[in-house]
From Swiss-Prot:
SUPFAM superfamilies, per the entry: NAD(P)-binding Rossmann-fold domains, Siroheme synthase middle domains-like, Tetrapyrrole methylase
NCBIfam families assigned to the protein according to its UniProt record, in alphabetical order: cobA_cysG_Cterm, cysG_Nterm, PRK06136.1, PRK10637.1
Pathway(s) the chain acts in: Cofactor biosynthesis; adenosylcobalamin biosynthesis; precorrin-2 from uroporphyrinogen III: step 1/1; Cofactor biosynthesis; adenosylcobalamin biosynthesis; sirohydrochlorin from precorrin-2: step 1/1; Porphyrin-containing compound metabolism; siroheme biosynthesis; precorrin-2 from uroporphyrinogen III: step 1/1; Porphyrin-containing compound metabolism; siroheme biosynthesis; siroheme from sirohydrochlorin: step 1/1
Source organism of this protein record: Actinobacillus pleuropneumoniae serotype 7 (strain AP76)
Region (Uroporphyrinogen-III C-methyltransferase): 216-486
Top-level taxonomy: Bacteria, Pseudomonadati, Pseudomonadota, Gammaproteobacteria, Pasteurellales
Sites bearing Phosphoserine, chain numbering: S128
Gene3D superfamilies: Cobalt-precorrin-4 Transmethylase, Domain 1 (3.40.1010.10), Methyltransferase, Cobalt-precorrin-4 Transmethylase, Domain 2 (3.30.950.10), NAD(P)-binding Rossmann-like Domain (3.40.50.720), Sirohaem synthase, dimerisation domain (1.10.8.210), Siroheme synthase, domain 2 (3.30.160.110)
Chain positions recorded as S-adenosyl-L-methionine binding sites: P225, G301, G302, D303, V306, T331, A332, M383, G412
Role according to the record: Then it catalyzes the NAD-dependent ring dehydrogenation of precorrin-2 to yield sirohydrochlorin. Finally, it catalyzes the ferrochelation of sirohydrochlorin to yield siroheme.
Protein name: Siroheme synthase
Length: 486
């Protein structure tokens, strides 16, 4: 981030503008909207600027620039076509530690003006840091069409009723829930759109009098395999309404960035063999936060009902009579294989896809290896790298050919995604080299990966320790290139 987006209170603060042409006029109009005390230094004034001076809205300070004029200024703007003068203004402001903007000259700007969408008192600022002003203009045009014009009226009403709402709801969570309900109320939106402010305020009063106690709830949300673009629309809406988010180790940083800024984020991650938070502790946290009247999101990598223990958590909530909902996510078996170029089913190679986990309960049922070893199917193994040797041996023992194509996808759908391909007899060796989290894919469909890979750089081949019948094993990675001698 090259610039920190901030909003500055310029009311009754002196701002020096050096220049009196049409460029200066544009900046001055914006400054006057913020009630700044604008002082102009220019040899002559644009006709529009002269009118502002005559009306007493702008002070014509002097015709020539002097360093002393900067001393008493809160902000400085240089808007002339004289490069030497602009440089002088910039150097003077910098030496006096005053923020300065030389118009259309980014290297000589300690601050810049963003593009503004004005729904006062609601304002939205957009900037590319000077990198792509045309792109920002196009974006602003799209947002102007999308953002309703009644936002300002809604915000004004909220300002007038803030004190009454705070008295009625002393807890922050209660107030937040009230405002969210009001701002999404169709009648409130319609009344403000039609400028029926008195009726809109009557609705606020009615909602205050009839408001029910705030009830807590829990939403299990699938975060998807990693790429934030794969988070569902409903998932995005849910995490942006949350008061507290309990997230696991498989949720990507990009997805966490989409969580509402003032929500509490609680890490409850665990990995096979490396438990950092016990499942029972996570269950109790869900219950505790919900009973505090909070909107709780349990954010899980992939889909909460695919090896995510989501069902176990809902059973606890059901026993405690806590309302809950589930927002499905794109599971890793779907997302990671798609990004790796491996179709799970194909008429020529696989008519069945099976998902299994390599992390079973110690006293759990054994896997049905006879079924897993059958042909014409794709086997996807979650959390299987630490059991890769056993997986390979058991499948071969029960009839799976040793030259069956396999792939290990690490960090699927993320920029550092890595795909290794080989054959079943080499699975343990491949797993040792694979970063985690990783997904194992076993089946003839892996043959297609070389031709169908589209995400990241082209796969790099390496020499295997043994011959294969279909192709040499490959490693796909944006940054890594390794070879193993025969």
């Amino acid at each position: 981030m090259n610039y920190l987006p901030i909003f500055v209170d310029l009311k009754n603060r002196p701002v020096l503008v050096v220049g009196g042409g049409h460029v200066a006029v544009r900046k001055i109009y914006a400054l006057l909207k913020a009630d700044a005390l604008v002082k102009v230094v220019a040899e002559k004034l644009h006709s529009s600027l002269q009118i502002l001076v005559n009306e007493g809205k702008v002070e014509w300070l002097a015709k020539a620039f002097e360093a002393s004029q900067v001393t008493s200024s809160y902000l400085v703007i240089a808007a002339t076509d004289d490069n030497a003068l602009n440089q002088q203004v910039f150097d003077t402001a910098e030496s006096q530690q005053r923020l300065v903007n030389v118009v259309d000259d980014q290297p000589r700007c300690s601050y810049i003006f963003p593009s503004i969408i004005d729904r006062s008192p609601v304002q939205i600022a957009i900037s590319s840091g000077g990198a792509a002003p045309v792109l920002i203009r196009l974006l602003r045009e799209k947002l102007e069409a999308l953002i309703p014009h009644n936002l300002g009226a809604m915000a004004d009403i909220a300002t007038r009723w803030r004190s009454a709402v705070k008295t009625q709801f002393p807890q922050l969570t209660q107030r937040r829930r009230f405002w969210e309900k009001l701002f999404t109320h169709q009648s409130f939106q319609r009344l403000t759109e039609n400028h029926q402010i008195e009726q809109a305020e009557a609705l606020v009063e009615s909602e205050l009098q009839n408001n029910n106690p705030v009830l807590g709830e829990v939403s299990l949300v699938g975060a998807g395999p990693g790429d934030a673009g794969l988070l569902t629309l409903k998932g995005l809406q849910t995490i942006q309404q949350a008061d507290v988010v309990l997230y696991d180790a498989l949720v990507s940083e990009a997805v966490l960035e989409l969580v509402r800024r003032d929500a509490d984020k609680v890490f409850v991650g665990k990995r096979a063999g490396k438990h950092s938070v016990k499942q029972d502790d996570t269950n109790q946290l869900l219950v505790k936060y919900a009973k505090q009247g909070k909107r709780v999101v349990r954010l899980k990598g992939g889909d909460p009902f695919v090896f995510g223990r989501g069902g176990e958590e809902l059973e606890i909530l059901k026993a405690e009579n806590i309302p809950f909902s589930v927002v499905p996510g794109i599971t890793a078996a779907l997302g990671a294989t798609a990004y790796a170029g491996i179709p799970l089913t194909h008429r020529d190679h696989a008519q069945t896809a099976m998902f299994i986990t390599g992390h079973l309960k110690p006293d759990g049922n054994r896997l049905k290896w006879e079924t897993l070893a059958q042909g014409n199917q794709t086997l996807v193994v979650y959390m299987g790298t630490i059991k890769a040797a056993e997986l390979s041996a058991e499948l071969q023992k029960h009839g799976k050919p040793s030259d069956t194509p396999v792939a290990i996808i690490s960090n699927g759908t993320l920029p550092n995604q890595q795909v290794q391909t080989g054959v079943l007899s080499e699975l343990a060796e491949l797993a040792e080299k694979a970063p985690t989290p990783a997904l194992i894919v076993i089946g003839e469909v892996v043959k297609l990966q070389k031709d169908l890979a589209w995400f990241g750089k082209e796969a790099v081949q390496f020499v295997s320790t043994q011959e294969t019948l279909w192709q040499k094993p490959t490693l796909q990675n944006k940054e890594t290139h390794w070879k193993q001698a025969a």
